[in-house]
Amino acid sequence: NAEYGRAMSGVVNVVTKDGGSKFEGFASLGVSTYSTENTDIFIGLSPDLNRSTDLKFNLGGPIIGDKVTFFTNVRKQTNLGHLNGLRLFNVDDYSNFYYDDPQLWYSEKSGDSSYVPMNTGLGLSALFKLSFNFIKGIRFSTLYSYSDDSWFGYDHGFKYNPDGRSESVKYTRYYAFQLNHMISQKFFYELKYSITDNEYGNYVFKNPFDDRYVHDVFFDSYGPG
């Protein structure tokens, strides 16, 4: 639709409420988990390990009467999923079964054998807005918002090396200034200026030269062993 097209082209119009002359707020916490009798399929599934939470909080009100008001909104989400792996191997472990002689085969297993959630997501978002009404008919506001999201997708090839999966990350920072001038009951204009800063990534370690990376040759299963 048109709104989606504008968002994809970088044209973003963020509309948020202003704080009022009285303090108003809201808070909520949601918690969920998983339970199953099929423990041979969903290994290690437990309420403590695979708990998900959703925390929401907002607050608005006056700073200087109705001349300066604020509004803030925060949300934190944690989803630890329902698919676990078993940490038999660490990321920098490697195995070598390329030799014909079994005496030369090598497998390094330095993991702690603990269960690790493998389809997870973490999200934190926040918004803060200041509104100013010093001059009749003129209102201006400043707004700052950010979101930090990270998630892992389940990969069966890493069931016993769950820390070897790459993590997806997304950071967004948004800054905005808005001026609204009401000239009459039928005529007004708005001026808006905003900056958006986005960062995306997908990696095991952020540094591509991290010496904990194991060469790709040790990832395939080819070899006599």
Task: Give, region by region, the residue ranges found by the protein language model.
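Short, P/G- and charge-enriched loop/turn segments at secondary-structure junctions
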Residues: 1, 43-45, 114-116
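A beta-strand signature from Gram-negative outer-membrane beta-barrel systems
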Residues: 1-28, 54-56, 64-67
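Outer-membrane beta-barrel pore domains and translocons
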Residues: 15, 28-32, 73-77, 145-147, ...
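Flexible, solvent-exposed coil segments and beta strand-coil junctions
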Residues: 24-25, 30-40, 101-111, 121, ...
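Sequence/structural signature of outer-membrane beta-barrel proteins
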Residues: 32-36, 79-81, 149-151, 198-200
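Surface-exposed strand-loop-strand hairpins of Gram-negative outer-membrane beta-barrel proteins
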Residues: 35-51
